[in-house]
Amino acid sequence: MPSMGTYIKAISGGAILCIGGPALVMWVTPTEEEIFKRYSPELQKKALARREQTQQDFDNFTTQLKELSKSEKPIWIAQKEADSHRSETEAQAKRDERDAYAAESRRRQAEIRASSQ
């Protein structure tokens, strides 16, 4: 049977690995600001220009997830239904736009025919 010293060594070694490993990763990993400072000036400008849009997209995504999580259905089913509803709405909007364009085209043709007679 191992001695008490062996148990202490094993426990202390495990503690060093379990606590020290994540601490080392946190210490070595650069922050977002440090990564941003390493960018070239043109990449910094692009990142600053996209930052607001990216933040807005993320806010929209989280808001949508919060709304979908209120339903009784699993979130992936609710997401699929919301996507299909949104695609139907977009398709209807495209059809309406196409119909309006066709009606405008017919109206112009009628005006041209009426003015040429």
From Swiss-Prot:
GO BP: mitochondrial respiratory chain complex III assembly
UniProt KW keywords: Chaperone, Coiled coil, Membrane, Mitochondrion, Mitochondrion inner membrane, Transmembrane, Transmembrane helix
Compartments (UniProt record): Mitochondrion inner membrane
Superkingdom of the source species: Eukaryota
Pfam family, one: CBP4
Transmembrane domains' residue ranges: 7-29
Main location: mitochondrion
Similarity comment: family membership: Belongs to the CBP4 family.
Role according to the record: Essential for the assembly of ubiquinol-cytochrome c reductase. It has a direct effect on the correct occurrence of the Rieske protein, core 4, core 5 and apocytochrome b.
Compositionally biased tracts (Basic and acidic residues): 80-111
A single cellular component GO annotation: mitochondrial inner membrane
InterPro entries assigned: Cbp4
UniProt source species: Phaeosphaeria nodorum (strain SN15 / ATCC MYA-4574 / FGSC 10173)
Full protein name: Assembly factor CBP4
Protein's UniProt keywords contain Disulfide bond: no
Membrane topology classification: Single-pass membrane protein
Chain segments carrying region Disordered: 76-117
Coiled coil: 45-71
